[in-house]
């Protein structure tokens, strides 16, 4: 009584190649870093600005 290996499952159906995500258009306006620099420089606080104050 020789053991017979089970037959491999049927080959998975060929998957369609993944499409690349559509390139997102760049948003107009200043970058986040520029906005932070402007907010901190406009602040009158001498000790800096907290994260909560920036939001």
Swiss-Prot record:
Q: Where in the cell is it found?
A: Nucleus; Chromosome
Q: Which Pfam families match?
A: Linker_histone
Look up the domain of life of the source: Eukaryota
Q: Name the Gene Ontology biological process terms.
A: defense response to bacterium; nucleosome assembly
Ordered alphabetically, the record's keywords are: Acetylation, Antibiotic, Antimicrobial, Chromosome, DNA-binding, Nucleus, Secreted
UniProt xrefs under InterPro entries: Histone_H1/H5_H15 (IPR005818), WH-like_DNA-bd_sf (IPR036388)
Q: What Gene Ontology molecular function terms does this protein carry? A: DNA binding
**Renumbered residue ranges of the record's region Disordered:** 1-28
Chief subcellular location: nucleus
Sites where N-acetylalanine occurs are at: 2
Transmembrane region(s): none
Q: Locate the H15 domain: which residues?
A: 28-55
Q: Where does this protein have compositionally biased stretches of type Low complexity?
A: 1-15
User: According to the UniProt entry, which residue ranges have a biased composition of type Basic residues?
Assistant: 16-27
GO CC term (a single one): nucleus
Function, please?
Answer: Histones H1 are necessary for the condensation of nucleosome chains into higher-order structures. SAMP H1 has antibacterial activity against Gram-negative bacteria E.coli, A.salmonicida subsp salmonicida, V.anguillarum and S.typhimurium and Gram-positive bacteria B.subtilis and L.ivanovii.
As for family, the record states: Belongs to the histone H1/H5 family.
- What name does this protein carry? Histone H1
């Amino acid at each position: 009584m020789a053991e017979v290996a089970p037959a491999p499952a049927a080959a998975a159906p060929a998957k369609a190649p993944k499409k690349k995500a559509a390139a997102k258009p760049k948003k107009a306006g200043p970058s986040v870093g520029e906005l932070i620099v402007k907010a901190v420089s406009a602040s009158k606080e001498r000790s800096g600005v907290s994260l909560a104050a920036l939001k």
